[in-house]
Amino acid sequence: DRRMLDVGTGTGLIALMLAQRSAAWITAVDIDVECATQAAENFAASPWADRLDAVSVAVQRYDPVEKFDLIVSNPPYYVDSLLSPDEGRNTARHAAGLPFGELAAAVVRLLSPGGRFALVLPPVEMQRFRSAALGRLYPVRWTEVCSTPRRGVRRILAEFCTTPVPAPEPARLIIELGGPDSYTEDYR
């Protein structure tokens, strides 16, 4: 059976999407107890409750019995911005609780042989992650996401493995053409 891990699950949305599209066993971890509790409630209310598990733990300390075939993360990424007085908001939005080097180390430790790691980050933060993961994780897919043809890259969707491979040719995904209801075919 395939096993998947969602790091920094928040409310569990990405884990639920994985469950909807696969028959895998999915574990979702979040350092924030309230987030993990909310994710567990959302999982229990879903048709896939028997394959979803939410755990409140920092991924750096997570020690499961088995490794994962796919690890996904849309992690907190603000590094240089001001912190909020709300500690929970800081945990959800700032990389201080999960530095990219520690994320890369956790992924390498938790990934099964031949497994993949999918990551979503803005461009500057993705470059910071790649620097932190240098020599440990290698990109196999790379998609630059733009909201419209005239706007710059807003996010990068990247997939990594632990085996050195040639760098992939970047793909570009444009979400809309600029008018109302003008989503591109690729985005739909």
Show the residue positions of the predicted features.
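Conserved SAM/SAH cofactor-binding pocket of Class I
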Residues: D1-S73, V79-E87
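Short beta->alpha junction loops/turns
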Residues: D32, P122-P123, P180
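Short, well-ordered secondary-structure micro-motifs
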Residues: V65-E66, L83, F129-S131, R155
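Mobile active-site "lid"/loop adjacent to the S-adenosyl-L-methionine
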Residues: P75-E102, A106-R109
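Conserved Class I SAM-dependent methyltransferase catalytic core
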Residues: L98-V153
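SAM/dcSAM-binding transferase cores
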Residues: G152-R188
